[in-house]
Amino acid sequence: MRIEAATETTRELLDALTSLLAQLNPQLKPLTMERLARVIGDPATTLLVVRDDSRIVGAAAVLVYATPAFVKARIEDVVVDEHSRGKGVGEALVRRCLEVARERGAEIVELQSARWREVANRLYPRLGFELRESNLYRLNL
């Protein structure tokens, strides 16, 4: 297993992420090459992929940004292919996300996980995350 930052917009990456994101949320619109290029080109974002041999089996995005209060990191879209789950891929991926956040100067790291993702919700406290009481608001533009 190898975890690396995606630095090029390729058809292989697009196809792998499209498949992975559909497993994360089947209602998401398909990823486009333009959106993928925007993610990879965004200096605040590090897109990590997990390869098993040459196949991409997992991914996550780490966003680091500054506010007046903190330099924050958010871990987004953590997903491991259903055939690779239970092998420590997700834990290794999140640990690498935390390394990226530290390397980029983050003081705190936040992530959000759906309640039904039971395995993920057991993993995060083991890695030091604390469940927070919060009202999360969203507005689709």
Residue ranges and their predicted role:
Residues 1-17:
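A short beta-loop-alpha structural element at the N-terminal edge
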Residues 28-49:
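Active-site rim helix/loop that mediates acceptor-substrate recognition in acyltransferases
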Residues 65-75, 85, 132:
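A conserved beta-turn-beta hairpin within the catalytic core of GNAT-like acetyltransferases
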Residues 80, 86-99, 122-126:
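Conserved acetyl-CoA-binding loop-helix of GNAT-fold acetyltransferases
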Residues 101-113:
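Conserved GNAT acetyl-CoA-binding A-motif
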